[in-house]
Amino acid sequence: MNVFELTGLLLTLTALFAWLNRRLIGLPSTVGVMLLALVFSLLALAAVPFGANVAGPAGDLVSAVAFNRTLLDGMLGALLFAGAMQVEAKKLFSERLVVGLLATLGLGLSTIIVGTLTWGVFIALDLGIAPIYAYLFGAIISPTDPVAVLAILRRAGVPKTLEIQFTGESLFNDAIAIVLFVALSEVADPNVAASLEPGYLIQLFSAEALGGIGFGLVVGLAGFVLLRGIDDYKTEVLITLAMVIGGYAMASALHVSGPLAIITAGLLVGHHGRDKAMSEHTRERVDTFWELIDEILNAVLFVLIGLEVLHISFSTHAVIAGLAAIPIILVARFIAVSVPITILRTRRSFTPHAIKILTWGGLRGGISVALALSLPDSDARNLIVNMTYIAVIFSIGVQGLTISRVARLARTDDDAAASEKTT
């Protein structure tokens, strides 16, 4: 199957699942298409003993797509840019301490807690897996992906500050987690680890992260200058596309963080570019274009997550480890959210029940699956892929469908407390 045929088949499946969800089910788009793709995959597997070989061609499709490369080298830049474009930079700046601590300290705490407790699971199940892979799993599963839940949060009436915290954290901790994953992967590789010098990982992390932000500023400023020089929405859309695709490719060639570069460029264009370099007509067209790109790519991404079950070989021990990881991840998320908020409570106020909502709304998604699939073939890789997939399906399927209820309950508690004070 060539690229054109793959793209056509994948878009057709995505459109079909999106139509079925909108027409018959009515779930949030990304959650609905993922669950429909998952049901389709499970039915295809169940039909194999009866002679209906749907799972084979569908599995070939998933293999040919190469989920990790498709996301990390293709879709991720556009998704991050679209997300950054929608963020109100002034409000994000006002939440910089919260977002910064959640995306760094919170991510680090989650990685350590998940890694340590997962190592305990490895020992309890006598899996014989090296401890470094437990911490790799921690880095893989810790970044949040609230794309699927933001629309639900808005519908539930969550305050704007909490939306900004969710969005800002997810954008930056996705990018930072990828850098952390690369660093831990080098430690896990015995051929590389033996030659590593003290301080190398800190140097690598700093070069990737700071280099990515610096390069993103260059791309964003260059894009701003080009956008300000013309007033033609078709050309300006093309410029933003070039910033994403060309900028991401160049960042990879320069060995700096492509995700951080694109986020930085997207924030610059979304704030300064939209206000000072685009006419109102162009702003509407550019916003509509990137909103559409965001919706389409997210739908395709979550369909791929649902279909990925056809390509994963599950084992009993791996499934048990994956199920055990779910409460571990939730506990780690609770601590990773609680510590930064507790530190900052002396300096500012927070939305009531912020810890509860940020904990339960911290969904895991495609980034985690892609990172797990990018590991080199080994028993440890198969285990981590199993665990990651189970955790992601639970996160999107259970947390994604119940976060609005959690938000409403929190709001109801606040209303009840307020009425008691007035009586």
Give, region by region, the residue ranges found by the protein language model.
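Transmembrane helical cores of multi-pass secondary ion antiporters/exchangers
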Residues: 1-423
